[in-house]
Amino acid sequence: MFIISLTYIKPLEEVDALLEEHVAYLKEQYFLGIFLASGRKVPRDGGIILARAVSREEIETIISLDPFYRHGVAEYAISEFTPTMTSDDLAFLRE
């Protein structure tokens, strides 16, 4: 499991110009079963994505497809973790 933290490095005007493309990218990753949750940080200086994938390399490849990444408007930090405790609703995530 991975936590992907995006931090915007360009003005919000540049981020917003790519938002529709970024949302389409997110929807595709949800459809493929890779992304589990995502949303904006508060304050709005980036976002968080929860994802599952086979490897860090796979996540890095998936991130490289994000319009925010391709256009250089955000930096990405990837943290891998093993969920050992969850609420009952998220039991399917436990390893």
Located regions from the model:
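Conserved, structured core segments of small domains
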Residues: 1-95
